[in-house]
């Protein structure tokens, strides 16, 4: 029973994603790892490695999986940096993104 009489289905319509910011240092300059997107939206554009989190997946596990699948990198220490949650930031609907670095 729902004592608040709220339709909770409205609250379960968002997706979650993880972006992995990976920095490198070469020839005195800091570099950021980018990938070329292979799917829409934004196919063939440069992006920070990121993807959706599976419904049954913990966030740190998702970050490791996404970085491995998109770049081949493994065993990279990462920490949560920031969460982006503006409702209009993604063309396909509300996506809450957790950034790792």
Positions of PLM-derived features:
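Short Pro/Gly-enriched beta-strand edge/turn motifs at strand-loop
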Residues: 1-5, 80-83
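N-terminal strand-loop-strand
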Residues: 2-47
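Conserved Nudix-box catalytic region and its N-terminal flanking loop in Nudix hydrolases
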Residues: 29-76, 83-85
């Amino acid at each position: 029973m729902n004592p608040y009489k709220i339709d909770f289905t409205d609250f379960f319509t968002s997706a979650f994603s993880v972006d992995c910011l990976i920095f490198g240092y070469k020839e005195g300059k800091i570099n950021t790892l980018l990938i070329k997107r292979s799917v829409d939206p934004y196919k063939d554009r440069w992006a920070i490695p990121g993807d959706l989190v599976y419904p049954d997946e913990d966030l740190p596990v998702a970050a490791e999986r996404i970085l491995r699948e998109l770049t081949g990198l493994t065993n990279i220490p990462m920490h949560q940096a920031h969460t982006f949650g503006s409702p209009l930031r993604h063309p396909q609907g509300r996506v809450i993104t957790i950034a790792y670095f």
